[in-house]
Amino acid sequence: MTVPALTDAAVRLAGAPDIAAFLSVWLEGGLLDGAAAETFRHYYGSFRRSFTGRTRRYYASQIAEAEALVRARPGARVLEVGCGLGTESLWLALQGGDVTGIDLRADRVAGAQARLAVMQRLGHAQQCRFQFASVFDLPAGAQYDLIWMEQTFHHLEPREQIVRKIASLLAPGGHLVISEANAWNPALQLELLIRRGLPRVIQLTGDDGRAHPYGVERVTTAANLRRLFADAGVVCQSIRHFRMFPNRPVFDRFSVFETAPGTAAILPLFLYYNYVGVRR
């Protein structure tokens, strides 16, 4: 990439009004090369095919609670569990967070580190780091003001131990924000049943050679998430359900229905929810 192009990318990344605009700069290509570029293309394949206005809006709103918490507390210690290629971690660092992203996929951590190197070369996201690690690898004394998980919790096992570990990593008054698929949604459950059979826990050998339990799309409800973390000392502050239709342009015309209030009667229609809890 030429110097003028890099300068333009730096301005657009730093000046992005939301995370969707931030990701769009990366989707245009040219900032990564080699294995990192290939991993990025595969990881964001659906967004590269279609990143429409509706999809962009929901992608931007998905991180709204975590984003607001970081902006309200510059320098907040942030942990992203299951960071993937690091888009949310990098964005939260741009908002003023001191961010650590962890993942158990070596290729994704390498891709996130490559993106971080680009950001830091452009003068951004200095307070950010990515580690190949599980939450169980984090020291007992580690404390975070915000823990963020996006479509990760349903993979983490053993579930009860995960909940206790996550709660222990939260500083007093720290927040937990989890974005998850809604187990009440019948269409989602049918799709998952066809794709993976019954929800189950399997043993996987990680990229580091260690065996660990893995939840095969063990999605849960917001009510169950609230109960699990309440038992571990994390009190629910809010739950927000959103989005009814998949990420395909054909559904854009129905977006008006997705703004309907999330009353109990229509909760099964929503695909996702965000849970926000605070450690007392």
Please name every model-derived segment:
Residues D208-A223:
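Acceptor-substrate binding/catalytic loop of class I
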Residues T87, W91-F136:
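Class I SAM-dependent methyltransferase SAM/SAH-binding core
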Residues L138-A140, L193-R195, A223-A230, C236-R280:
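A C-terminal cap/extension of S-adenosyl-L-methionine-dependent methyltransferases
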Residues E160-H175:
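A short glycine-rich, Lys/Arg-flanked "PGG" loop and its adjoining helix->strand segment in the class I
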Residues T2-R73, G75-G84, V177-I202:
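Conserved class I S-adenosyl-L-methionine
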